[in-house]
Amino acid sequence: MPGLTPPVNYEQVYKVLAIGFLLCASIYCLRSNHLPHVGDNIHSLPHGGNYADGTKRVQYFRPHSSTSTNHKYTALCAVLTLSLLIFAQTRLAAGNRITSVSICHHCSSQGSLSGGNHGRVSGHSELPTT
């Protein structure tokens, strides 16, 4: 029947767009400058330094704190930790699944359905019926 076709699956397109967006956001965050602006429109000393002109003098030293952390490595550790937690959660969830084989005890052990595997487990001999 025309008109009863399944809808187009855009899952792969959304995955590619999400990966591209995350890649662009990651590159932007890693390359953006978050240091305070020091100097004027002509002279910039973002990493510290000295500048002396006829009427002005600028001394700016490298910003530091008692707890020096590199935020790039902090973000990397957060991403790796979250990835590890998600992976562990999926592995634990897969281990908790209950899988069972249903065997019809009312049918003959020869298998009355097409395929001949009704009442048998693949790779094993026939199971006794009660």
Curated annotation (Swiss-Prot):
Keyword Transcription recorded: no
Chain ranges passing through the membrane: 13-30, 73-90
Signal peptide: none
Region described as Disordered: 110-130
Keyword flag Transport: yes
Protein keywords: Host endoplasmic reticulum, Host membrane, Membrane, Transmembrane, Transmembrane helix, Transport, Viral movement protein
GO CC, any one term: membrane
Pfam families, per the entry: Plant_vir_prot (PF01307)
Any one Gene Ontology BP term: transport of virus in host, cell to cell
Cytoplasmic domain ranges by topology: 1-12, 91-130
Subcellular location: Host endoplasmic reticulum membrane
Lumenal compartment spans: 31-72
Family, per entry: Belongs to the Tymovirales TGBp2 protein family.
Main function: Plays a role in viral cell-to-cell propagation, by facilitating genome transport to neighboring plant cells through plasmosdesmata,.
Misc note: TGBp1, TGBp2 and TGBp3 seem to act together for cell-to-cell propagation. TGBp1 is the main movement protein that physically cross the plasmodesma with the viral genome. TGBp2 and TGBp3 would facilitate TGBp1 function.
Record protein name field: Movement protein TGB2
Organism: Narcissus mosaic virus (NMV)
